[in-house]
């Protein structure tokens, strides 16, 4: 009666099943359309009497256990994650999420375990316009369930005071919501893997998904057998301090200083480093959209070339960090009408101060290509791209409209440009579309958003990626407990990572980067070298290996098994414990080889 219809195509494919909704077989009436379709919302649903849980990719990964239904509020709600980031383009909401440590879904998956059986569902087509919905027992019905919702139209806000009838505004200072007229015309397809027995758990799901990504050429192999675990060193170089009359440039690390710090670390035994330079461009960090040239006060182009030569001679991998997505109108160099992301109301997407903008994906790619051509004339280093593994968005810009799929294409074009020119590419964030390009992943979360439906955090993302692409989480020098931070690196398989400066961090107190509250290299380089040497002595044997099993043995104790037969036990408690017949000291870890030999 609504004049709406669709076709659901279901096919069995070995030990998996595909479910597809072809775009050309969706029917809509003249005045009625589809906003979203929730696919098979009760497939695999179970109540609290079943031994099982729901898995979802919130940050590192999280699970909701059926048995804990009584520990949840009677008014428990479902939670939804937009895959690859929020559907609504909102500067302020994005900043608040990061401030509150709320994470997004970087992988387009969910899992359901019911006793000795489990499913893993993964979006194969249309992930960028899909949401993951997790509904615990007690929300509407007494069933635990998870599903995908395919989004076919976006909502956008309009100012209702702009609507005029008979010469007068209908509603003053009131915002309303509209929906796109045109449907997103892409096929949607989900693959559902069936697991049983010993594989019917989140470890089995991670193994299944990793092998699927490898087979589909969606996950790059970067780490080579017997590689050292590199020290990830980020050097913060410069930033402007805003003052009443004249801004002051604050120099934290020059190119010559970068060589000095690298030498200190090398002399302390660090012979494998990945160095990332941050705030190296003219004007300093955060002066978007300036991407070139190097700041003269840091040594300019000559200093960059000297550091590049030093790095090449010492077999160091260098990444020059840059941002091609964000812009600030105070810095000029772009049009706030033609070059930035627009809302459906034909107004630009801005932050609270109305000076922050996002670049249209086509314009962002154009700026990147221009930068890369000039950059390549001066050095042969790698590029680190901020935000492209975190942010995708749609743009109503009339000159160059873009959906979320087109935005991903432009981000992939940037990465492809780097790789085709035989440069390494680092990416901030780890959305799945970067995994076939990235040589390094930055800021990968080692926790979930800790919503009230979550019972346990699991390193699902790390289990998929470990042994393939190196990744970092948070800077060790900014942790409040270095020992506990180190144990988290061991459990989650992260590179040791420090963000340091040549000058004292107190120089940043009056800048917008005062979050780097302890970074003076004199205070940290020995600890960085100690962790590097310890990890390579004890954990090098698993660096290139896949994590095939992760188990919580008891409170604060975890067992991680690798594809070469080596097992690592991590004890976060202050007390010594016994686990599987092995003694583990408080706040420590052990590495057990195939023959039971402890390292």
Label for each model-derived stretch:
Residues 39, 275-278, 320, 384-387, ...:
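Conserved beta-strand positions
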Residues 270, 379-382:
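A structural motif
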Residues 21, 265, 311, 489, ...:
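Conserved, mostly hydrophobic/aromatic
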Residues 1-251, 259-273:
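Carbohydrate-recognition beta-sandwich/jelly-roll modules
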Residues 28-30, 46, 284, 329, ...:
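Intrinsically disordered, low-complexity acidic/polar segments
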Residues 224-367, 390-394:
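Aromatic-lined carbohydrate-binding/catalytic grooves of carbohydrate-active enzymes
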Residues 12, 23-25, 41-43, 279-281, ...:
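A mature extracytoplasmic/lumenal domain signature
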Residues 104, 112-158, 182, 327, ...:
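Active-site-proximal substrate-binding groove within the catalytic cores of carbohydrate-active enzymes
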């Amino acid at each position: 009666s609504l004049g709406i219809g669709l076709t659901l195509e279901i096919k069995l494919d070995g030990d998996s099943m595909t479910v597809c909704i072809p775009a050309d077989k969706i029917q809509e009436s003249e005045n009625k359309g589809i906003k979203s379709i929730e696919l098979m919302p009760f497939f695999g649903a179970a109540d609290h009497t079943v031994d099982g849980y729901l898995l979802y990719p919130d940050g590192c990964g999280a699970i909701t256990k059926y048995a804990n239904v009584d520990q949840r509020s009677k008014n428990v709600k479902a939670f939804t994650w937009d895959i690859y980031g929020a559907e609504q383009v909102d500067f302020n909401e994005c900043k608040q999420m990061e401030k509150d440590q709320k994470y997004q879904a970087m992988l387009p998956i969910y899992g359901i375990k019911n006793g000795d059986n489990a499913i893993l569902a993964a979006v194969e087509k249309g992930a960028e316009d899909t949401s993951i919905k997790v509904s615990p027992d007690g929300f509407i019905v007494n069933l635990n369930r998870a599903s995908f919702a395919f989004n076919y139209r976006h909502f956008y806000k309009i100012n209702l005071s702009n609507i005029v009838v008979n010469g007068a505004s209908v509603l003053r200072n009131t915002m309303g919501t509209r929906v796109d007229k045109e449907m997103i015309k892409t096929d949607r397809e989900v693959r559902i893997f069936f697991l049983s027995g010993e594989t019917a758990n989140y470890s089995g799901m991670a193994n299944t998904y990793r092998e699927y990504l490898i087979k589909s050429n969606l996950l790059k192999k970067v780490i080579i057998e017997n590689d050292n675990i590199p020290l990830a060193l980020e050097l913060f170089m410069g930033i402007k301090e805003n003052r009443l009359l004249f801004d002051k440039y604050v120099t934290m690390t020059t190119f010559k200083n970068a060589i000095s710090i690298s030498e200190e670390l090398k002399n302390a035994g660090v012979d494998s480093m990945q160095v990332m330079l941050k705030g190296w461009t003219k004007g300093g960090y955060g002066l978007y959209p300036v991407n070139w040239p190097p700041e003269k006060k840091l040594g300019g182009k000559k200093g960059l070339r000297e550091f590049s030569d030093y790095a090449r001679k010492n077999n160091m991998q260098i990444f020059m960090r840059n941002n091609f997505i964000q812009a600030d109108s105070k810095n000029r160099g772009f049009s706030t009408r033609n070059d930035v992301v627009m809302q459906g109301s034909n107004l630009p997407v801005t932050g609270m101060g109305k000076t922050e903008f996002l670049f249209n994906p086509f314009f962002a790619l154009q700026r990147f290509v221009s930068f890369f051509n000039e950059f390549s004339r001066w050095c042969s280093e790698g590029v680190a791209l901020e935000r492209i593994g975190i942010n995708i968005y749609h743009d109503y810009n009339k000159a160059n409209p873009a959906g979320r799929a087109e935005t991903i294409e432009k981000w992939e074009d940037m990465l492809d440009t780097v790789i085709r020119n035989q440069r390494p590419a680092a990416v901030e964030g780890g959305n799945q579309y970067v995994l076939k390009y990235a040589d390094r992943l930055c800021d990968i979360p080692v926790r979930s958003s800790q919503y009230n439906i979550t019972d346990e955090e699991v390193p699902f993302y790390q289990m998929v990626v470990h042994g393939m692409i190196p990744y970092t989480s948070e800077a060790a020098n900014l942790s409040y407990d270095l020992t506990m931070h180190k144990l988290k690196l061991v459990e989650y398989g992260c590179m040791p990572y420090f963000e340091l400066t040549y000058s004292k961090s107190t120089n940043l107190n009056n800048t917008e980067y005062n979050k780097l509250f302890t970074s003076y290299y004199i205070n940290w380089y020995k600890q960085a070298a100690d962790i590097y040497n310890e990890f390579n002595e004890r954990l090098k044997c698993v660096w290139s290996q896949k994590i095939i099993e992760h188990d919580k043995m008891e409170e604060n104790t975890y067992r991680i098994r690798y594809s070469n037969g080596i097992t690592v036990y991590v004890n976060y408690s202050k007390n010594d414990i016994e686990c599987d017949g092995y003694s583990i000291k408080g706040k420590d870890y052990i590495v057990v080889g195939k023959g039971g030999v402890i390292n």
